[in-house]
C-alpha cells in the first residue's frame, strides 16, 4: 500500500470545501465570463462591435453591474486574466465588485488546447508551466476558484485511450496545484457535441471519461470535497437524426454521473455546450427532476447560454445597456430556478431559442 503523505492541512481542506459549497449553494450557479480575447471576437463581431479592450470591458461591466436579483442565482463568476484587472467606469475593480456582492471570483488558468501527436486530431490542454506561481498571484488578487478545460470528441476512432488518459492526468495535476494554493479547481472534461452519435454512445463515452478523471484525481491525492465538476450533459451529437426529450437527456446524464462521480464532490456545474438558452434551462430543470438519487448539487456554469440574449440586445450601444442587463438577469433567474427543478418554460421565444452551437468549439 502506498504511504500517505498529507497534501493539505485540515484548515486548507475546510477553506476549499467552504468555497466550493458557496459557489453551488441552493439555486446558485456560475456565470462563465472567461472568454479569451479571440473568443470575444466571435461574440462581438456578429453584433457589429469591434473587439477592443474597452468594448470587452463595457460588455463585462454590463453583466457585472446587474442589480441584486442576480445575487441569489449567481454563486461564482469565472474571469479571463484581462477582466480580473479591469475596472468599472467609476474605478471599482471588477473582482472587488463581484466579491463585495458575496459572489465568488474565479479565473480561467489553462492556455488552450494543443494537438496530441499520433491521434486522429485529438488534443490535450497546456498551461501547467508556472501554474503554481500564477495561482498564488490570482489568490492574492481575489480569485478563490479556477477553471481548466480539456476537450474530447466522439467519432468512430475517438476519444482514444491516450487522449482520455492524458487529459485526465493533466486535469488532476492542475487540480492538485490549485488546491495547494487555496484555489478550488473546476475540473472540465468537455466532450464536444459534434458528430452524429446517439444518446447511448455519448453516455458510454461520458462514463469512460469521468471514470478516468476520478481515477487520476485519486492518484494525485486531490481533495474531492474541495473540487467542482464541469461536465457536458449527455446529449446526442448535433448531426444525429434522432431527437431526444429533455427527460431522456436527464436520465442519461444523471445515470452517467451516478456511475462515475463520487458523492464527495461538492457540486456539478454543467456547461451549456452550444445549446440554446432555453434548451440549457429546460435540460437543467429536467436533470434536477430526474427520479434518481442525486448526491451533489446539479447546477450551471454557462457562458453563451447566459449571455446570448444580452449580447443581441446590447449591440454595443450605451442606450441598450439597461435592456441587455435585463436579458442577462432573466436568464440567470431562469437557470437559478432550473437548478432547483422549478423552472417553467415559456416556450422558445426570440433569441433564447436560437442554437448557440459552434463546430469544434475552441475558446
From Swiss-Prot:
Q: What class of enzyme is it?
A: lyase
**GO molecular function per UniProt:** fructose-bisphosphate aldolase activity
Question: Where is the site Necessary for preference for fructose 1,6-bisphosphate over fructose 1-phosphate?
Answer: 363
Q: Which Pfam families match?
A: Glycolytic
User: Any idea which residues are catalytic in this one?
Assistant: 188 (proton acceptor), 230 (schiff-base intermediate with dihydroxyacetone-p)
Query: What EC number(s) would the UniProt record show?
Result: 4.1.2.13
Q: How does it assemble?
A: Homotetramer.
Protein name as it appears in the record = Fructose-bisphosphate aldolase C-B
Amino acid at each position: 500500500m502506498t504511504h500517505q503523505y498529507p497534501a493539505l492541512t485540515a484548515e486548507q481542506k475546510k477553506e476549499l470545501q467552504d468555497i466550493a459549497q458557496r459557489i453551488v449553494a441552493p439555486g446558485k450557479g456560475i456565470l462563465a465570463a472567461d472568454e479569451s480575447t479571440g473568443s470575444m471576437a466571435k461574440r462581438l463581431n456578429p453584433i457589429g462591435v469591434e473587439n477592443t479592450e474597452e468594448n470587452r470591458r463595457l460588455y463585462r461591466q454590463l453583466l457585472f453591474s446587474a442589480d441584486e436579483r442576480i445575487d441569489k442565482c449567481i454563486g461564482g463568476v469565472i474571469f479571463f486574466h484581462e477582466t480580473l484587472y479591469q475596472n468599472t467606469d467609476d474605478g471599482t475593480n471588477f473582482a472587488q465588485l463581484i466579491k463585495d456582492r458575496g459572489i465568488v471570483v474565479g479565473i480561467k488558468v489553462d492556455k488552450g488546447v494543443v494537438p496530441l501527436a499520433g491521434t486522429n486530431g485529438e488534443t490535450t490542454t497546456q498551461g501547467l508551466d508556472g501554474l503554481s506561481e500564477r495561482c498564488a498571484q490570482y489568490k492574492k488578487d481575489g480569485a478563490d476558484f479556477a477553471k481548466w478545460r480539456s476537450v474530447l470528441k466522439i467519432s468512430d476512432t475517438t476519444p482514444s485511450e491516450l487522449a482520455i488518459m492524458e487529459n485526465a492526468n493533466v486535469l488532476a495535476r492542475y487540480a492538485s496545484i490549485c488546491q495547494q494554493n487555496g484555489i478550488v479547481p473546476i475540473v472540465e472534461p468537455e466532450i464536444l457535441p459534434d458528430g452524429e452519435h446517439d444518446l447511448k454512445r455519448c453516455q458510454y463515452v461520458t462514463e469512460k471519461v469521468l471514470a478516468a478523471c476520478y481515477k487520476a484525481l485519486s492518484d494525485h491525492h486531490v481533495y474531492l470535497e474541495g473540487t467542482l465538476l464541469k461536465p457536458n450533459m449527455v446529449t446526442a451529437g448535433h448531426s444525429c437524426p434522432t431527437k431526444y426529450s429533455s427527460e431522456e437527456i436527464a436520465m442519461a446524464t444523471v445515470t452517467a454521473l451516478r456511475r462515475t462521480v463520487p458523492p464527495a464532490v461538492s457540486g456539478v456545474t454543467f456547461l451549456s455546450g452550444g445549446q440554446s438558452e432555453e434548451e440549457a434551462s429546460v435540460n437543467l430543470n429536467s436533470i434536477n427532476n430526474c427520479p434518481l438519487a442525486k448526491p451533489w448539487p446539479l447546477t450551471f456554469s454557462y457562458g453563451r447560454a447566459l449571455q446570448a440574449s444580452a449580447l443581441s440586445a446590447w449591440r454595443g450601444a450605451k442606450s441598450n445597456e439597461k435592456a441587455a442587463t435585463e436579458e442577462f438577469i432573466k436568464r440567470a433567474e431562469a437557470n437559478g430556478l432550473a437548478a432547483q427543478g422549478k423552472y417553467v418554460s415559456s416556450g422558445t421565444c426570440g433569441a433564447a431559442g436560437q442554437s448557440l452551437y459552434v463546430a469544434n468549439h475552441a475558446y
